[in-house]
Design a protein with these regions (language model features):
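Secondary-shell segments that build the walls of catalytic and ion/ligand-binding clefts
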Residues: 194-252, 257
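Short amphipathic alpha-helix starts
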Residues: 9-10, 355-356
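A detector of short terminal or domain-flanking linear segments
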Residues: 334-355
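Active-site cofactor/substrate anionic-group-binding motifs, chiefly glycine-
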Residues: 47-101
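Phosphate/diphosphate-binding glycine-rich loops and adjacent basic-rich segments that engage nucleotide
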Residues: 147-216
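A generic, well-ordered mixed alpha/beta core segment in the N-terminal half of proteins
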Residues: 80-170
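Catalytic-core signal marking the mid-to-C-terminal active-site face
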Residues: 2-5, 11, 245, 250-336
């Protein structure tokens, strides 16, 4: 596959312009552009530039309100909440970030809830941002409409309900864990459906509640949690925190994020921890020594670190974007005020909720 190498500045400028053309405010567009390019830098293209058409569609069709201004409230010194007002969670996070970080640094721990937003994109982005300030971050979201069954069930009640966790390091990129509660991410089943490949057993059930290895049947049916009941328990925990505590839509009530005019209204819950206030100033040294021991003595994989190193390299030499996608985005920009996505060849949307 041919690729175009774009600088970070070039990619952000293109994404920013497209979002503004489709009705997003400058602030909203800037927040989303930064997040999508960061995902691309991290080697997660399906929630990077390939995800941009879903955002543009959402603006054009009314699922996201790119002009609304999120509302930030601070009901307690270390508790912040933002009503995204059907705008993007990335903007809501940027609005609250400085106060959120300050609260965690002063109080030792702080909580930020975001509700009434469009889908959050790459969850690891939010917790990585916290490590820039020396904070440990934990995040979760009920990312959209129901796709996954509860333990023992055959009907969808949860979305993929990811969790993300990040720890800063004294030197080098942070350790980052970012994974769904489902047996696999939605994008993997979509890729299999596009290529015609079978999926492993244990990933999904068909529309009749039977195990399936057919990815298209999986998309018509229901996803399964990883690890059976244990994964389903985590999905339930995420649902109760990311939707229940924030006041967002439950996944079973969330509208689709790829069709219709209603915002999914999902929620994000983030927790920031200042470790030095609990342990003292030697947390960095203690943590780095432990991670080095795991890697060197036990050959353990340390998630997120290699991605972070690769992101630094890409930031210097440029981001590789499939040429077809880059050309399509350029063509869409040249349409300017026409906003007609139907004039372009559609790429499979990595965030569809069902194949009809």
């Amino acid at each position: 596959m041919a690729h175009y190498r774009a600088s970070v500045e070039e990619a952000e400028a293109l994404v920013l312009e497209l979002l503004r053309q489709h009705g997003a405010s400058s602030a909203s567009a800037a927040s989303v552009a930064r997040a999508l390019v960061e995902a691309q830098l991290q080697g997660k293209p399906n929630v990077g530039l390939a995800h941009l058409p879903a955002y543009l569609d959402s603006l054009k069709e009314g699922r996201a309100d790119g002009q609304s201004e999120p509302v930030l409230e601070t009901p307690a010194p270390a508790v912040l909440r933002v009503d995204a007002r059907q705008n993007f969670p990335q903007l809501a996070f940027d609005l609250a970030c400085d106060a959120f970080v300050s609260a965690a640094q002063n109080c030792g721990i702080a909580v930020l809830s975001i509700c009434n937003g469009y889908t959050s994109g790459e969850l690891g982005y939010y917790v990585r941002r916290l490590t820039d300030h020396g904070l440990v971050g934990l995040g979760m979201t009920n990312a959209g409409p129901a796709l996954m069954a509860a333990s023992g069930g055959t009907t969808p009640v949860f979305c993929t309900n990811p969790l993300a966790f990040a720890v800063p390091r004294k030197s080098g990129p942070p350790l980052v864990i970012d994974q769904s509660s489902s047996a696999t991410a939605l994008v993997k089943i979509l890729k299999a459906a596009e290529s015609g490949e079978a999926i492993p057993e244990g990933w999904a059930l068909d529309s009749n509640g039977k195990p399936t290895r057919d990815p298209k049947e999986a998309l018509r049916g229901v996803f399964l949690a990883f690890g059976g009941q244990r994964g389903a328990n985590l999905a339930l925990m995420v649902e109760l925190l990311a939707a229940g505590v924030t006041g967002a839509n439950w996944s079973v009530d969330a509208p689709a994020f790829n069709k219709g005019e209603r915002c999914p209204g999902t929620g994000v819950l983030l927790i920031a921890l200042q470790p030095d206030l609990l342990l003292g100033a030697d947390f960095d040294e203690r943590c780095e020594a432990y991670l080095t021991r795991l890697a060197e003595d036990h050959h353990a994989h340390l998630p997120g670190i290699q991605r972070g190193l690769q992101a630094q390299e890409r930031r210097e030499r440029g981001i590789e974007v499939p040429s077809e996608l880059w050309q399509r985005l350029q063509e869409l920009r040249d349409l300017k005020d026409e906003y007609d996505l139907s004039k372009l060849k559609k790429q499979p949307n990595p965030y569809v909720s069902r194949l009809k």
